[in-house]
Amino acid sequence: MNEVATQGLVAVAGATGRVGSVIVEGLSDAGAAVRSLSRTPSDPDTAGARSTSRHIDYADAGSIASAVDGASVLVISLGSSDDQARQEIALIDAAVHAGVEHVVKVSSWAWPSRMHPIDWHLQIEDHLSKVDIGYSLLRPMTFSAVIGAQANLIKNDLWGGAAGTLPANLIDVRDVADVATRLILSGAASGPVRRPYHLTGPGGLSMDAIAEHLSLAIGRTVKYTHRTPDEQRALLLSLGLPDMIVGLLLGIDVEAFASGASTETTSTVEAVLGRPPRSIPDWITESAGLFR
């Protein structure tokens, strides 16, 4: 990032997560004042004179209020869980009460759905729209890292699902984080402005095409086995995955991939960053070690 940070304190909720950790790193490297918020208790000292960390207890209203107090911008990037909507709404309400000027919410490529976590994100977005605070909504396509979550299945020749044959335009989590960081450092994510940003990769690939790229990257044949939703559910449950995770994975397959909802391409990442987003083959090449 080339900007020199001039805004006030940025509080980052979900600071140890896949997106949040990269945001914290980017802001800290640019000299921004950052407060990293995490459920994991930690010392108040972190690397960087303008960066601190703080434990946040989402069951304690006082802890939430203290976490956002004094911040100009609040980044919300929590992981998917049954408590996600409650926790993020509590953060938003605390931010409004504390006088935080702007929320950067890492959401999802959303459409009306009962599928988790899309319905949770929509609930949070609806609440955010009704309170008096500026916001930047980052709505990314499914992350490329969803392939990495299948690493054990790929290693054991069990990879497959109900994703169908349409291309999925997955996005690298680093691009999502880089967009958030650039918006904050440039001042675009500040004050009362309210704007969504729809984020995708540079172009989609089908699961069969992704399998071909995996094969080239690791030097052995990888196949994607097409299954019905019921067959995929039975397999995942037999492997001991929790019901919620099984539901998330099946929902992505059926509602995001097979439906064609993940085929779109936007120019938003390049417009914000001045460079194209990382491609799925790029991610596979960098992450090949996960699948060997």
Name what the model sees in each region.
Residues 2-49, 56-65, 69-71, 80-89, ...:
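Oxidoreductase cofactor-interface core, primarily capturing Rossmann-like NAD(P)-dependent enzymes
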Residues 3, 16, 36, 192, ...:
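A hydrophobic C-terminal alpha-helical subdomain
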